[in-house]
Amino acid sequence: GAALEMKFKEKLDNIESLMKSIEPYEIARTEKIRQRLVESLSSIPEVEYDRGRLEQEMIFYIEKLDINEEKQRLTHHLDYFRETIDSEYGQGKKLGFIAQEMGREINTTGSKSNQAEMQNIVVMMKDELEQIKEQVLNVL
């Protein structure tokens, strides 16, 4: 039991550090998106557009790609998983449900990540989570 608990905590820590390693890419991609849109518009000189409207649309687009909520919920699920393994035994199904929720947040992060580096990190997070799910089956 103790070895399994240590394995869970190691994998949870790995997911958490991978999630934090996304942040530099997340900040840079917002600026890249803005630059790409501005360059695209300036490459078509005859197009006139309302600059204020463009800023509104860019904010809307960037908000759709924002992953702060997913990161916040994933952090909560990681903490809840830790609390659950620290509590009484017989929590296998509950751990399975929490792992499912972590998977949803990781998948949504991947869907919103339109940058190869971020998607690579998401794949690594999925790999760590898959190992957790395999170990949860040993607890059931």
Language-model region placement:
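N-terminal intrinsically disordered, cationic/polar leader segments
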Residues: A2-L140
